[in-house]
Amino acid sequence: MQTSPLLTQLMEALRCLPGVGPKSAQRMAFTLLQRDRSGGMRLAQTLTRAMSEIGHCADCRTFTEQEVCNICSNPRRKENGQICVVESPADIYAIEQTGQFSGRYFVLMGHLSPLDGIGPDDIGLDRLEQRLAEEKITEVILATNPTVEGEATANYIAELCAQYDVEASRIAHGVPVGGELEMVDGTTLSHSLAGRHKIRF
């Protein structure tokens, strides 16, 4: 079926979103045009503004429309002395929702991957090293993903922290709450056993 060129362009543009295939893009385009043109206009305007105005925080590299994000500019966060290193801005949102961390962050925007030509400077480790040298950081919490690349990245950063006498710790990976042991993979179970803690009464 031949569609209008502009409609085809709209569907192709929507396919840049993760998980959106041809059918989903078609459904989204038709929904916006048939039922929610005002919503479509609002989406277009907000998307245009976001693409032109949102950049990276000068300190932690997360997304923000300011030079320094709200977390990094918070005096209480600075006094905490902890920096949590994550792979993406989405990880910050996940950790913030727990309400268990009151320090600042550093976003790598990826991980080390020599096979893909991604080295330390490509993920901002030169900037992290500068912060280790200049700021009063007491602990770096490594919250990279539990993948081969994530572990390699965490180990590299831990060695970097040691050069500046800054404590480095790795977040625990283990059995999910409500999970059954027989369904957990061996690597996760190994991490759980290694990271066990004593029960005190």
Swiss-Prot record:
It comes from the Bacteria. Residues 81-176 form the Toprim domain. GO terms for biological process: DNA recombination; DNA repair. InterPro entries: DNA_Rcmb_RecR, Rcmb_RecR, Rcmb_RecR_Znf, TOPRIM_dom, TOPRIM_RecR. CDD domains: TOPRIM_recR. The keyword Cell cycle does not apply. Transmembrane segments: none annotated. Keywords: DNA damage, DNA recombination, DNA repair, Metal-binding, Zinc, Zinc-finger. One of its GO terms (molecular function) is zinc ion binding. A zinc finger (C4-type) spans 57-72. HAMAP family: RecR (MF_00017). PANTHER family: RECOMBINATION PROTEIN RECR. Belongs to the RecR family. May play a role in DNA repair. It seems to be involved in an RecBC-independent recombinational process of DNA repair. It may act with RecF and RecO. This is Recombination protein RecR. The gene is recR.
